[in-house]
Curated annotation (Swiss-Prot):
The complex is composed of two ATP-binding proteins (LsrA), two transmembrane proteins (LsrC and LsrD) and a solute-binding protein (LsrB). InterPro entries: ABC_transp_permease. The gene is lsrD. It comes from the Bacteria. Keywords: Cell inner membrane, Cell membrane, Membrane, Transmembrane, Transmembrane helix, Transport. Coiled coil: none annotated. It is found in: Cell inner membrane. Pfam families: BPD_transp_2 (PF02653). Part of the ABC transporter complex LsrABCD involved in autoinducer 2 (AI-2) import. Probably responsible for the translocation of the substrate across the membrane. It is a multi-pass membrane protein. Belongs to the binding-protein-dependent transport system permease family. AraH/RbsC subfamily. The chain crosses the membrane at residues 7-27, 45-65, 67-87, 90-110, 118-138, 162-182, 212-232, 240-260, 261-281, 288-308. This is Autoinducer 2 import system permease protein LsrD.
Amino acid sequence: MNLYRRYGWELTLAALLVLEILLFGLSNSRMLDINVLLFSTSDFICIGIVALPLTMVIVSGGIDISFGSTIGLCAIFLGIVFQAGVPMSVAIPLTVLVGALCGLINAGLILYTGVNPLVITLGTLYLFGGSALLLSGLSGATGYEGIGGFPAAFTDFANQTLFGLPIPLVIFMLCVLLFWLLMHRTHSGRHVFLIGQSSRVARYSALPIARTLCMLYAMTGVASAIAAILLVSYFGSARSDLGASFLMPAITAVVLGGANIYGGSGSILGTALAVLLVGYLQQGLQMIGTPNQISSALSGALLILVVVGRSISLHRHLIYEWLQRRRSRKASV
């Protein structure tokens, strides 16, 4: 009973995930093939790598919608640096540093201006996206071709397996463990929850708000860079649009995973399960021949339903009191 109280939503998501796979399996038996389930994660698991630190950002009361552009910028930066003759062993760490810098720019602007994080990251979304397009044009990369010619060892990396699991999935699982420990087993993780519950109380309690926010946004930038590196390896080319479609699925996964969009609560394990739920939803719809437009519309509808459901859950005591008052009025009449 205590386990269900503590992990009730996560267990519900796990049950929904199994049910979803079984339902799609009735329409297409390939959905029940363990190899298909494992290797199809490579198409969407990079969304999860970014969604994990994004969960911590949202729990802190902030938000970052610029990560898609950060992925594109890091991808094209990696391609340009490689074109310039820099070895991949140096280009990859430099790309991670660029991602961290993008995150620190977000944090610095939010802390310095005091403007809502949504507005700041909306601005940097266009800033990083425009920079990626500019660099792409300067490098001569056009259309869907991007920058190619990477070493075979690099392009094979994201398509290899470790213990029978795809490398991107293994990296995602390691990230889940890392962020779960950070969020639920460290003082920094407790600070994230406290800042999200009340930034004013956190400030009066002398919590390191600035340092914590810088860490969170920098981690989101680093995760975006890692996702960019994996995507370039997976597709074999660096393009400025690689993260363009990540925004809605990532935020949907975070909110569906149990994070309060207003801050103060959230779950890394819930986000991880929600990533699989949303990812397999899109994969399953494609397998049964559903157009991409309908798949995107369903993802949007799912996000709205989750936000409405979470809002009702958070204010259920107010709704209950309102219903009680209505019954009392009717009884008195």
